[in-house]
Amino acid sequence: MAPRKAKVQKEEVQVQLGPQVRDGEIVFGVAHIYASFNDTFVHVTDLSGRETIARVTGGMKVKADRDEASPYAAMLAAQDVAEKCKTLGITALHIKLRATGGNKTKTPGPGAQSALRALARSSMKIGRIEDVTPIPSDSTRRKGGRRGRRL
């Protein structure tokens, strides 16, 4: 009879979703905040912008359609995103703020300010803040006709 072979114990590899970092090291992500007058999106990616880390909208946080773009819904969305980022090890964010743009309004919606404040207050460090609203050099004709929108 052949001698028994000793059982080899396999080492369990712990899988981490976030980046491999030391304690106290600052890891940056990019928060894309799109604030229109109908909804607010808070979308966090890695620095390249390819990998989505978390994406929450104002509409996911409130029941009524009229409240989707409200500052309160944007604040809840930003707090959710910050919580997810912390669990994955992201401690700091660069912010790219965007309004509708194009041939529509270039003003960010009501949720932009409160989303940014909520990210800052949830102990996330803020790096650069940039406005990435698409502004045309020469646009197509805006809706409303020759005489404009009549109220």
Swiss-Prot record:
Biased composition (Basic residues): 142-151
Source taxon at top rank: Eukaryota
Gene name of this polypeptide: RpS14a
Keyword set, alphabetical order: Ribonucleoprotein, Ribosomal protein
Family: Belongs to the universal ribosomal protein uS11 family.
InterPro entries noted in UniProt: Ribosomal_uS11, Ribosomal_uS11_CS, Ribosomal_uS11_sf
Residue span of region Disordered: 131-151
Species: Drosophila melanogaster (Fruit fly)
SUPFAM superfamilies referenced in this protein's UniProt entry, alphabetically: Translational machinery components (SSF53137)
GO cellular component, one term: cytosolic small ribosomal subunit
Coiled-coil intervals: none
One Gene Ontology molecular-function label: structural constituent of ribosome
Gene3D superfamilies registered for this protein in UniProt: Ribosomal protein S11 (3.30.420.80)
Biological processes per GO annotation: cytoplasmic translation; ribosomal small subunit assembly; translation
Protein name: Small ribosomal subunit protein uS11A
